[in-house]
Swiss-Prot record:
Name the UniProt record assigns to this protein: Imidazolonepropionase
Binding site for 4-imidazolone-5-propanoate: R85, Y148, H181, E249, T325
Pathway: Amino-acid degradation; L-histidine degradation into L-glutamate; N-formimidoyl-L-glutamate from L-histidine: step 3/3
Organism: Caldanaerobacter subterraneus subsp. tengcongensis (strain DSM 15242 / JCM 11007 / NBRC 100824 / MB4)
EC number, as in UniProt: 3.5.2.7
Binding site for Fe(3+): H76, H78, H246, D320
Cellular component, GO, one term: cytoplasm
Length: 415
C-alpha cells in the first residue's frame, strides 16, 4: 500500500464511527486503537489501524506517542464581524443592565455599526485571524453566520466575504444566512416590515448567488417571536435552504418545538427547551448544539446536557464565538466547560465536537471521524488520554493539525 502521508507512533486513536449523529449511550461509543497509524492519500484517509502495517509513504510524521483525534468542527460561530465590546463589561460591572447598554446604542447595535463601517479588507483580516486561532486549537471546519449587517446590502456583503474566506484559509468554511439575528433599530416600531424584507429581498438574493446553505433565525423574546421565526424559516425552506434556529436561550420561545416541526438540521442554545421541544426535535433528527461559552460569560445556567442526552437527542458543542456573549475562539475551553459544568463525559464531548458537530452542518459523510474514505482532518494532541485534555483546562493541548485541502494535505505544527 502506497500513501502520500503516513502518521505513525500514535499512542492511541480516539474516534466516533459513522456518518450519522450519535445519541444517547451511543455518544460514548468511541473506537480506541492503541499503537496506531493513519495513512492518507489524495486528501482522504486511506487506512487507520494498529501498527505495524505494510505501508510506504512519500512523507511521514512521527507522532511521538501523542493521541490522534478527528479534526474538531465548530458548528456555530459569528466570525464575520468587526469591533469588540469590552467597554460593555466595564458598564456591567458598574451595574448597568443589557437593556441600559442597548438604550445607549450598545449591544448588538454597536457591532452592527462597526461591521457596516469596516472595509472588506478589515473584515477579512479580522476573520482570518480568528480562523487561525481556531485552527491552532484543532478546529478544521467552521460554520460562520452573517447577522451583523441587518440590511440587504450588508448581509449580502458579509456572505460574499465568507465565500472569499474559503480560498484564503486552510479551515473549511460553511456559511449560514442569519439576516434575522436582531430587529434593526430602524425597524423597531414595526418588526414585521423587517421580516418581510428578509423574506422578499434577502432570502431570494442569497439563493440567487448561492451564498449560504443554511438559514438561521434568532427565535427569542426581544428578537424574533415564534410566528416571525416560523414565517422566515418556512419561506427559506421553500427556497431550498436547510434550517437552523437559535432556540430557547433566555426564555422558552418554543424554538425547540419549531425546530422539530420544520425539520431543522440543528437547534442551538436550548437552555430553556421544553420536553415537548425535545421530543419534536428527536422525531425530526435535529441536532442539539449547546454553547456553554455563553453561559460562562453571562454567568447564566448551562443547558442541561444530561437531560438532552438521556432523552435521546444528539448533542454537539460550539463556541458561539461572537463579541457580545462568547468572545472566544477556543473550542477546547468549551469542551472543558462541558466536562466540568455540564457533566458530559469525555467520550460524549469528543463525539459532540466531531461527528455530531459535522452532522449539525450536514458534513457527516465527509468529516468528523478517523475512518477510511473520510477527509484527512486530524489533530495530534499532547495528552496521555482523552479525559486529561478536558481536565487540564485553559491551555492548548494540540501539537499538530493535519488538514486536507482538496487532494493535498497541509501539516501545521502548533508547538
Amino acid at each position: 500500500m502506497r500513501a502520500d502521508l503516513l502518521i505513525y507512533n500514535i499512542s492511541k486513536i480516539y474516534t466516533p464511527i459513522g456518518t450519522k449523529p450519535l445519541c444517547g449511550e451511543d455518544m460514548e461509543k468511541i473506537e480506541e486503537i492503541e499503537n496506531a497509524y493513519i495513512a492518507i492519500k489524495d486528501g482522504k484517509i486511506l487506512a487507520a489501524g494498529k501498527s505495524p502495517a505494510a505501508i510506504s509513504a512519500e512523507r511521514e510524521i512521527d507522532a511521538k506517542g501523542m493521541i490522534a483525534l478527528p479534526g474538531f468542527v465548530d458548528p456555530h460561530t459569528h466570525v464575520m464581524h468587526y469591533g469588540s465590546r469590552e467597554n460593555e463589561m466595564a458598564l456591567k460591572l458598574k451595574g448597568y443592565s443589557y437593556i441600559d447598554i442597548l438604550k445607549q446604542g450598545g449591544g448588538i447595535h454597536s457591532t452592527v455599526r462597526a461591521t457596516r463601517e469596516a472595509s472588506d479588507e478589515a473584515l477579512l483580516q479580522k476573520a482570518l485571524k480568528s480562523l487561525e486561532i481556531m485552527l491552532s486549537h484543532g478546529v478544521t471546519t467552521v460554520e460562520v453566520k452573517s447577522g451583523y449587517g441587518l440590511n440587504t446590502e450588508q448581509e449580502i456583503r458579509l456572505l460574499r466575504l465568507m465565500n472569499q474566506l474559503k480560498s484564503l484559509s486552510v479551515v473549511d468554511i460553511v456559511p449560514t444566512f442569519l439576516g434575522a439575528h436582531a430587529i434593526p433599530q430602524e425597524f423597531e416600531e414595526n418588526p414585521w416590515r423587517y421580516v418581510e424584507k428578509v423574506i422578499n429581498e434577502m432570502l431570494p438574493k442569497v439563493k440567487e448567488e448561492d451564498l449560504a446553505e443554511f438559514c438561521d433565525v434568532f427565535c427569542e423574546e426581544g428578537a424574533f417571536d415564534y410566528e416571525q421565526s416560523k414565517k422566515i424559516l418556512e419561506e427559506a425552506k421553500k427556497l431550498g435552504f436547510r434550517l437552523k434556529i437559535h432556540a430557547d436561550e433566555l426564555t422558552h420561545s418554543k424554538g425547540g418545538e419549531l425546530a422539530g416541526i420544520l425539520g431543522a438540521i440543528s437547534a442551538d442554545h436550548l437552555e430553556e427547551v421544553s420536553d415537548e421541544g425535545i421530543d419534536l426535535m428527536k422525531k425530526a433528527g435535529t441536532v442539539a448544539v449547546l454553547l456553554p461559552g455563553v453561559s460562562f460569560f453571562l454567568n447564566r445556567p448551562y443547558a442541561d446536557a444530561r437531560r438532552l442526552i438521556e432523552r435521546g437527542l444528539p448533542v454537539a458543542l460550539g463556541t458561539d464565538y461572537n463579541p457580545g456573549t462568547s468572545p472566544t475562539e477556543n473550542l477546547q475551553l468549551i469542551m472543558s466547560f462541558a466536562y466540568i459544568n455540564m457533566k458530559m463525559r469525555a467520550e460524549e464531548i469528543l463525539t459532540a465536537v466531531t461527528l455530531n458537530a459535522a452532522c449539525a452542518i450536514d458534513r457527516g459523510d465527509e468529516i468528523g471521524t478517523i475512518e477510511e474514505g473520510k477527509r484527512a482532518d486530524i489533530v495530534l494532541v499532547d495528552a496521555p488520554n482523552l479525559d486529561y485534555m478536558m481536565y487540564h483546562f485553559g491551555i492548548n493541548h494540540v501539537n499538530t493539525v493535519i488538514k486536507a485541502k482538496g487532494n493535498d494535505v497541509v501539516v501545521i505544527g502548533i508547538k
